[in-house]
Amino acid sequence: MGIDRNLAYLLHAATRQHLPPSRPAVTLGVQARHGGPDPFAAMGLGAVESIDVSDFEGCTHLLDLNVAELPPELRGRYSLVYDGGTLEHVFDTRAALRNIFGLLCTDGVVAHASPVNGWVEHGFYQFSPTFFVDYYQANGWSPLGAFLLHLRGGGRATVHHYVSGMWDALPAGAISGLWLSLMVFRKVPGARWDVIPQQSFYRRIHEDASAPPIAAGLAYAPPFDLVDGVVAAEDRVVRRLPRPSPGVGYEWHAHLPQLEGVADTTEGRLSPLLLFEDGRPLGPPHAAHQAIRATGHGLYSHWGAWLHFSTSDNAPPGERVYTYSLPRAL
C-alpha cells in the first residue's frame, strides 16, 4: 500500500504534538512513498529500515511476523513502526501485534494504515477501527489519532475522525466503496501487548449502556476532504436551527421537513448535515436515538423530517445558538 500524500498529512497531524524519539524507524514491508515530502524525515527520525518475510523487494531485515520471538538486535530498536497494509496479510495477528510491541522503544509510535472495506481477497482480513482502538486501549497505549478515509479517486479522500461507538447505529450496507483506516498509538511506559480486549460495542451494551461514546482519548471532529495531502475547501450553507422541543431524556427535536430527502435511512444513506452549538461542532452524527436520550453530550441524528440531538453538556439549550450546515450543491 505504501504511504501517499493524504496518509502522510494525517500521520504528521497525529504525531506533531508527540514526536517519537529520534531513533530509527521501520516499515512492515518495503513501503513506497507516493509523492510529497518524506513524513519520517519531517518527524526527525533516524534511518528508515524495513522488515519483510522475503527479500524480493530488498528489505533491511528478514522476519516473519508470525514468529514467536524477535531477534535480540531488533528488540526496542525503533521509535516508529509503520504498518502500511501488512497486518492484514499476517495470519497470526496476535503474534504480529506482540512483535510490533517488541520492535518499539518506550514512547515509540505505531501507525497502522489498514483496509476497512472494499478489499475482498486483498489479504486475510479487513480490520474495523474498533479492532485497533479496543486493543490498544485495553493494553494502556496512548492514542494519537484515529482516522477513517473514504477513497474517492483522483487523490481525494473524505476523512472521518473515529471515536468508539460513533457508528454503532449504522445499518448494514451504510459503508460502501473503498475505505482505509489510519490508527496511531504511542507505547507509553507501562503499556502492554497481551491483554485481550472485549469489543467496546458489547461493553457498552452489557456493562454500561450510558458510557459516553467518546472513549480512549479520541475526540470527534467533523469530516473533511483531502486532495493529495491538501485540505479541500467545501462550499457549505449555514442556517439557524428552528427552535427545538424536548424529547425523551437528553433528547431535543428540531423540525426540518424540507431536508427529509437527505436524512439518514435504514438503507444506508447518511445525512451530510453538520450541527453546531455556538459555532462549535457537535457529534458524532448518525447516532442511535437511545444513545442520544441516555448518553447525550452532543450526539445527534438527522432522521426523516426531524433532527434528534443532545446538547454538549446535556443541559437545556437555553440561549445557546444552534446552527447546521449543508453542502451548497444540495
Language-model regions, residue ranges each:
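Class I SAM-dependent methyltransferase Rossmann-like catalytic core
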Residues: 1-23
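S-adenosyl-L-methionine-dependent methyltransferase catalytic module, highlighting the catalytic core
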Residues: 70, 91-220
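Short, P/G- and charge-enriched loop/turn segments at secondary-structure junctions
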Residues: 36-39, 166-173, 261-262, 294-297
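Basic, amphipathic N-terminal segments that precede the first structured/catalytic domain
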Residues: 2, 26-29, 290
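A glycine-biased structural micro-motif
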Residues: 21-22, 76, 309
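Extracellular polysaccharide-degrading/modifying enzymes targeting complex plant/algal/animal polysaccharides
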Residues: 221-330
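Conserved SAM-binding loop
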Residues: 25-121
